[in-house]
Amino acid sequence: MKIAVIGTGIAGNVAAYHLNKHHEITVFEANDYVGGHTHTHTVEGAGGPHAVDSGFIVFNYATYPQFTGLLAELGVEAQLSEMSFGVRCDTTGLEYMGSSLNTLFAQRRNLLRPSFWGMIGDILRFNRTAGELLADAENNITLGDYLAEQGYGEAFIHHYLIPMAAAVWSADHQLMEQFPARYLLQFFHNHGLLKVADRPDWYVIKGGSKVYAEALTRAHREHIRLSTPVLAVRREASRVIVTSAAGDETFDALFVACHSDQALALLEDPSETERAVLGAICYQDNEVLLHTDSSLMPRRRRAWAAWNYHLQDTVAGAGPVAVTYNMNILQGFDCDQQYCVTLNNSAAIDPHQVIARMHYQHPVYTPESVAAQGRQAEINGPMRTYYCGAYWRYGFHEDGVVSALDALEHFERSQGDRER
């Protein structure tokens, strides 16, 4: 069969990897590189060039079984990373990093702050009582309402939980307050974030994340068209017509592996179900800068973490998410030059130290979007179209792989139905 795949993020690449074994595929990619959020930059510096990741960075073997199985199949090596989280608040001067008592109290006056001790108490209570909400499968309360209902303190909310969750999902404070609380707790539970100790080890791809993307696409690289955005998609009873700058091309089936909002915009003939499901899952744009300006890190070196959340205004967490990833810590670069990746806080970065500037889009999670995720099967198959992407679950690499495997399963089932 002739099959089109739109997008070379993790979902599109996994779908194409498997489809290429038995079908004639054409992969359309709007960017000038393969990978989507898998984005590695080769930076010349002291000690030789460094492959610095700016999108997908870390994974673990406990909660990424499909992705790590794929890495093993491809022979891609991983290296141990150091995962830690810290907060810097310009309004209050607060700085801490949560990996040890020394770093938790990197700012020694935190020992005398009742609000800081209250935050620690709330962290322990939140972790201890999470099971109650997890056991209530029908509870759709938002995170903001849940925190208010349970009486958590402002320090815990604005200096710990919302910054951590906002950093995980690249979402601003207002969006995080609308996040389904049980959905967040399920993710935290799965990733060991409700425990102070015994959390899973995290890893990065040795040589940068592009190494796995290159291995995954090696067999079908000649079928990938870079800088070729799809302009429109029209479905007919016996074929799918994909329009790009090259004109109209006809295929027997289509795998749509771009974002949900992009997918819906491409369809000339969306069904009511496609409108309802894809339209319920929105995205937020984030500006991302790769740079060497270490002034974005906490002022105290003891408080430097792998993930550093920057609170510039404590008034309901005003402004977009602002987090700096220290890539020396995450990717193990042994050099004096600090390589950082910062979301959104571009005005604070010395422009002379900027290496690259990107925009990535991330899913927005609400009770409505989570409900729509449960309807993936309703739109996978009709009109010869199959949807995959990390947005069908939590938005991470494992989710992209699982969504592609789900779409492939629907595809195989549809072929069996047509043959009967």
Model-assigned labels for residue ranges:
Residues L184-S244, E249:
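Helical element adjacent to the flavin cofactor pocket in flavoenzyme catalytic cores
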Residues H41-F67:
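N-terminal glycine-rich dinucleotide-binding loop that anchors FAD/FMN and/or NAD(P) in oxidoreductases
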Residues A11, Y33, D261:
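Conserved Rossmann-like nucleotide-cofactor binding loop
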Residues N20-E44:
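Glycine-rich FAD pyrophosphate-binding loop
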Residues Y61-A181:
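Mobile amphipathic helical/loop "lid" adjacent to a hydrophobic cofactor/ligand pocket
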Residues K2-V27:
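N-terminal Rossmann-like FAD-binding beta1-loop-alpha1 element of flavoenzymes
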Residues T228-Q361:
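Mid-domain catalytic core of redox enzymes
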Residues S99, A316-R420:
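Conserved flavin/dinucleotide-binding core of flavoenzymes
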